[in-house]
């Protein structure tokens, strides 16, 4: 849970926090996620894809600072993003304030630390964290999971605050006991539209069987290679050579199980220790100064 005002941002756990006084400002981490595996089973009759994915939150992410105010305003630092209803954070805040019957608003500062359109769930996490922060600031009997789903299929996962098996369109969540694991993230500077990624998959009809979740969890604990895959990786990497380069670089750095996260372009690989992760990240950044490289851990 986040510290009181003045401490470093931490993930938000709404179940353990006292309400905030109207005069208080709090800062929260909106954690990134990686998909330790992503199977796309097929296309549903409603036009969505049937997914089977292991999603894990990380200790790196965007930052949100939120305080009560007379009206709703959003400021964004670190990226050229809109600050009105075109921004998912703004829409999430507006949705909660309306559902809770709040007459006032909030001042929100979003500090973008994650690359845009990167497969790390940044926008969805920002939205979920906004919902939980406003629920702390303006407590009300609002169904947060239902509200989150109206904002995006990944948003409910970030309300959960832990690793989960995501099924359906990503909204059917089963918590998983994933150990803390050090890893390295690499984004080669490519933005990938999730819509495009799934369209390319559909063109190839490259649908996949379900993940071996038990085998994946056992391999994580034993620090073995993961029996996993990302169904989107082939179609996306075939069209974006920098993703192929990022995966090869992670493997050459001595890290295990390199994989693209979500629809890309961020790739990751697991390390045996924090020391190995940091050393590999430093080496990769030196070799590829234009890439975004981060050593981190699962939550």
Curated annotation (Swiss-Prot):
Keyword Nucleotide-binding: yes
EC number: 2.7.1.148
UniProt GO molecular function: 4-(cytidine 5'-diphospho)-2-C-methyl-D-erythritol kinase activity; ATP binding
Top-level taxon of the source organism: Bacteria
Designated gene of the protein: ispE
Family recorded in the similarity comment: Belongs to the GHMP kinase family. IspE subfamily.
Catalytic activity: 4-CDP-2-C-methyl-D-erythritol + ATP = 4-CDP-2-C-methyl-D-erythritol 2-phosphate + ADP + H(+)
Record protein name field: 4-diphosphocytidyl-2-C-methyl-D-erythritol kinase
Active site: 33, 154
Pathway assigned in UniProt: Isoprenoid biosynthesis; isopentenyl diphosphate biosynthesis via DXP pathway; isopentenyl diphosphate from 1-deoxy-D-xylulose 5-phosphate: step 3/6
Keywords noted in UniProt: ATP-binding, Isoprene biosynthesis, Kinase, Nucleotide-binding, Transferase
EC primary class: transferase
Coiled-coil residue windows: none
Species assigned in the record: Deinococcus geothermalis (strain DSM 11300 / CIP 105573 / AG-3a)
PANTHER family assigned to the protein according to its UniProt record, in alphabetical order: 4-DIPHOSPHOCYTIDYL-2-C-METHYL-D-ERYTHRITOL KINASE, CHLOROPLASTIC
